[in-house]
Amino acid sequence: MNSSYFPGVLGVRWVHTNRKLQKRKEEHGAFQDSLHFMIPAAETKDLGASVTVGNSLTRAFRQVDRICQRNNVPRLFRSQRFYEKPSEKRSRVRSERHRARFRAGIVRLVNLAKNMRRWGY
């Protein structure tokens, strides 16, 4: 049985060993194995990122920490540590949404105040 390797999220490997697909491939020589739909689209995320360690090990660890922060790994780790009931999740998501909107409004007001001060008000 011939298996193909498809890179996945965070180094997860998907091995495809479907006999029907293999038979279909053999019957249709130019048939392409299109499993791109199995790999989730993550445009801003770093999938399978690697850091080269040169002279400084601490610098490499800092780069790994930055990659993890950019991908929200610590937040995901904390959120998946304990089970969260669906009603609690809805409440948390609602609260996070409200906080983000409130924060954006405050940032907008502070920027407006800075601009008004610059304009001479």
Swiss-Prot record:
Function: Component of the mitochondrial ribosome (mitoribosome), a dedicated translation machinery responsible for the synthesis of mitochondrial genome-encoded proteins, including at least some of the essential transmembrane subunits of the mitochondrial respiratory chain. The mitoribosomes are attached to the mitochondrial inner membrane and translation products are cotranslationally integrated into the membrane.
Coiled-coil residue spans: none
UniProt lineage: Eukaryota, Fungi, Dikarya, Ascomycota, Taphrinomycotina
This protein's name: Small ribosomal subunit protein bS21m
UniProt-listed PANTHER family: 37S RIBOSOMAL PROTEIN MRP21, MITOCHONDRIAL, SMALL RIBOSOMAL SUBUNIT PROTEIN BS21M
Family: Belongs to the bacterial ribosomal protein bS21 family.
GO cellular component terms, semicolon-separated: mitochondrial small ribosomal subunit; mitochondrion
GO MF term list: structural constituent of ribosome
Taxonomic superkingdom: Eukaryota
Keyword field contains Mitochondrion: yes
Assigned keywords, A-Z: Mitochondrion, Ribonucleoprotein, Ribosomal protein, Transit peptide
Pfam families assigned to the protein according to its UniProt record, in alphabetical order: Ribosomal_S21
Record InterPro entries: Mitoribosomal_bS21, Ribosomal_bS21, Ribosomal_bS21_sf
Organelle targeting peptide span: 1-14
GO biological process: mitochondrial translation
